[in-house]
Amino acid sequence: MATKRKASALNAAVDDEPVDPSDELAFYCLGGGNEVGRSCHIIQYKGKTVMLDAGMHPAKEGFSALPFFDEFDLSTVDILLISHFHVDHSSALPYVLSKTNFKGRVFMTHATKAIYKWLIQDNVRVSNTASSSDQRTTLYTEHDHLSTLPLIETIDFNTTHTVNSIRITPFPAGHVLGAAMFLISIAGLNILFTGDYSREEDRHLIPAEVPKGIKIDVLITESTFGISTNPPRLEREAALMKSITGILNRGGRVLMPVFALGRAQELLLILDEYWETHPELQKIPIYYIGNTARRCMVVYQTYIGAMNDNIKRLFRQRMAEAEASGDKSASAGPWDFKFVRSLRSLERFDDVGGCVMLASPGMLQTGTSRELLERWAPNERNGVVMTGYSVEGTMAKQLLNEPEQIPAVMSRSAGGVSRRGLAGTDEEQKIMIPRRCTVDEISFAAHVDGVENRNFIEEVAAPVVILVHGEKHQMMRLKSKLLSLNADKAVKVKVYTPANCDEVRIPFRKDKIAKVVGKLAQVAPPSDQDDGRLMSGVLVQNGFDLSLMAPDDLREYAGLTTTTITCKQHITLSSASMDLIRWALEGTFGAIEELGSNERSKVKEESTKAVNGEQEIKEEPADEEIPMEETQTYLVMGCVLIRYHSRTREVELEWEGNMMNDGVADAVMAVLLTVESSPASVKQSAKLKHHHHHHSDLELPNPHAHQGPEETFENLLMMLEAQFGSNIAPIERPRIPSGIRANRTTKADPSVSAAVKTKSDAAGETPAESQEDESTEEIEAAELARLQALGIPYPGIEIKVDKHVARVWLENFEVECANTVLRDRVRVVIERAVETVSSMWGEGHPAARASNGTQGNKEVAVSKSNEIEARA
């Protein structure tokens, strides 16, 4: 019973051509698939492997926070690229370098490495001292982190580096200081990995831009916000200030959980600028607390050149103010805030009155921000303002739902004594803290929203898009939106949303392009009109780059030295003459070139020439003259030299060793080794002996004499198809002899033209055209009758080999072809076919028959033409 096919199966395009596994791009998602956190991806193409990011999940602990490293052999990774310093993108790097079999090279930007050093060091300390579990697994130590720092290599934006035939180019991503998008090129396939990126104009970062003049084949991009749209920047800044001032006006404290570096610096610029324009707020302090806050601010002051024009303008302005005041100790940098104070820890914090506190970490899992949350949450006058993205499973995400209580993880007594490990037992886990503070969310996360991300994807115009770094529902909404845009596109975009541990394989067949250099670059390339002209040279591959050059240029352009290997082979034949050898070689290779022989006169002439400018030396007469051996030399296919020594019947082959010449030499040796035993050679040898011995006039019987013209023609086609393929067809229309065409053009009777004019006008033809068509048909019919009387079934045969066409006229076996190589080859094959199959249409050699038996028949055709013209 027939089953109904799915519509997708009926509409799917069928591609029967198999795909080479090396032509497939493999994408493995070890983390960050359908989730935000522990970003880690693997791309493989043409035997090259690149790892993108190595982060940890902020909502998990121990090995569960790591990407799924066990699913992939990290020893095969060539390059590891870190997009930026955030923990969900870089904090697993010390584990990879110190605890796995990773052997590749690691790259990040200068600013990323500078901040990464302090950020990961602080993260290790906080994780080991403030944990929600008594049995926390230590993934790596501070020593592991510091010892692996020298393994990290730094690169600049907009610079291209080639590592193991992989080209990488970082571009500004606009997410945080040093954040980079990476363009990866492998064997001509361009892959753009955005990491976390932002296209929004802010106060200190350069927004991300599409790489100019580069065709992107695969785009790997974040999908953090899906298709959600953020309000304009000015509206969000106004809402932020309104929320903060509202909390302060009611006598409360403002807690802003942020990452120690990144958005915190942008928020500090906004607050410092607002406080400067509002004197009534200047009595309220702004605190920026964190173990690495002060040290990392030095990094921001160092890399002002990597920031946007706003920071550079502010830097020049404050430098001018400092010079004008004459006080060299005055603050002159854009990161020297007037109203922001840095705190190392809460030990020196006097928690009295209103304030604005920026504390890390941003997810409120542990650390200073969690301790302040537990301290301020019971007071309804206080407020929490969330400005970053909140990951699923974290306290920050739970707080957005405004729960009535929160679990106590960090706690301090009134005297400032710390109680550690509150969540270590079941009894301590029951301790809950009431939440009465307000919770506001105003997004300043430096991620593209739905509109910005979609516009960027459209501008890149990559045929393949892979979405990562996004919750499943956000990712699927963005995928649906992108697929809905395919209706107006000629080339449909493929969108992939792999989950963790998923593998995506995408076929890419890239054309191999070779760059012509050296002497060959000065030769004009062959045009379409050139008949089979080829450009030959040496193809050199360096990684995935191909260069075509002349052998003489190998040392200069490829750094290679060349060695020519001359091969020689000696074969001794018992009875074959050079005539038989040449006949056999021409039957296989077509026309061969004769280079001459070393006759004694030439040798004597060379020996009597003056030496070093001296006079000719007079030779003494010899007592006995030894006959000089004559050597005949021929060149086969322009590469194999054959020397035949007639006295010893030794054949010497010499050629320059390479793949092409070796094949030709093998074929020549195969012909020579069978020349004395093959049936065709025996027949030819008997014919040659018969011509030389005139005492025997007995003719050999023709085994094909009983064949008719049609059978003979079929045998001829069979032999031609064996040599040139099946694209052979008979020619139906004969050639009109040149003598008949001349008579038709020179003899023209005006009275006949006038008589025919009235008939041709009715038919819509001119008299000359009508008369010419009728006479041509009758002449062709007479020519066909003449050929059939000779036993020739068709005027000729047309042979097509690739784009070349050869025509063989069977009356005299004349070959017409624009390509000289094919013409000579067809001529030799026709002669061998005639001699092997039968005597064709008459007795004797084809050329002799054409000259002896054609003249009378042509005279009959000419007289027939004259008769037609007279009758007309």
From Swiss-Prot:
Q: Which gene encodes it?
A: ysh1
Q: InterPro entries given for it?
A: Beta_Casp (IPR022712), CPSF73-100_C (IPR021718), MBL (IPR050698), Metallo-B-lactamas (IPR001279), RibonucZ/Hydroxyglut_hydro (IPR036866), RMMBL (IPR011108)
State where the protein is found.
Answer: Nucleus
Q: Which family does it belong to?
A: Belongs to the metallo-beta-lactamase superfamily. RNA-metabolizing metallo-beta-lactamase-like family. CPSF2/YSH1 subfamily.
Instruction: Write down what this protein is called.
Output: Endoribonuclease ysh1
Per its database record, what is this protein's job? Component of the cleavage factor I (CF I) involved in pre-mRNA 3'-end processing.
Q: Which residues form the active site?
A: 447
Cite the binding residues for Zn(2+) 2: 88-89, 196, 469
Give the enzyme's EC designation: 3.1.27.-
The yes or no answer to whether the keyword rRNA-binding is present is no
Mention any one GO cellular component term assigned to this protein in its UniProt record.
Answer: mRNA cleavage and polyadenylation specificity factor complex
Q: List, in alphabetical order, the GO biological process terms annotated in this UniProt record.
A: mRNA processing; secondary metabolite biosynthetic process
A single Gene Ontology MF term assigned here is: RNA endonuclease activity
